[in-house]
């Protein structure tokens, strides 16, 4: 299982990457493996304000449909529109081309509450 050290994580298997004042978000390698082959992703709308813990979309695989939750509060400034035609990118590269959305205006307290890669990995055992 791939687990980049430079990302932050949630217990719900989302990852968060700080980049130039914004935060890129996706699901972890563990999560995509549990879901199986992903066939559809419902994305939030650019301009939406999302609240930590709220369902902001869904990920459909051959096994199940799973809600995707906001790991932090913020404003959606971009979504990975490539996933509309190629949702399997989440399976093949969840930390790069399989990213899901980008937020700004993020609550700093939400970021500090996220898990390090070591703490996230301990929770998987």
From Swiss-Prot:
Look up the record and report any one GO term of the cellular component aspect: cytosol
Q: Which co-factors does it depend on?
A: (R)-lipoate
What keywords are annotated for this sequence in UniProt?
Lipoyl
Q: At what positions is N6-lipoyllysine found? A: 63
The task this protein performs is described as:
The glycine cleavage system catalyzes the degradation of glycine. The H protein shuttles the methylamine group of glycine from the P protein to the T protein. Is also involved in protein lipoylation via its role as an octanoyl/lipoyl carrier protein intermediate.
Quaternary structure (record): The glycine cleavage system is composed of four proteins: P, T, L and H.
* Protein name (database record): Glycine cleavage system H protein
| Biological source species | Listeria innocua serovar 6a (strain ATCC BAA-680 / CLIP 11262)
């Amino acid at each position: 299982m791939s687990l980049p050290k430079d990302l932050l994580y949630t217990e719900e298997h989302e990852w968060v990457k700080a980049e130039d004042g914004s935060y890129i978000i996706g699901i972890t390698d563990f999560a995509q493996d549990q879901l199986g082959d992903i066939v559809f992703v419902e994305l939030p709308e650019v301009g939406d304000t999302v609240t930590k813990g709220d369902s902001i979309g869904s990920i459909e695989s051959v096994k199940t449909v799973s809600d995707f939750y906001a790991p932090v509060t913020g404003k959606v400034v971009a979504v990975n529109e490539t996933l509309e035609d190629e949702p399997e990118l989440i399976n093949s590269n969840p930390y790069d081309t399989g990213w899901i959305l980008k937020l700004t205006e993020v609550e700093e307290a939400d970021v500090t509450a996220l898990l390090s890669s070591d703490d996230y990995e301990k929770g998987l055992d």
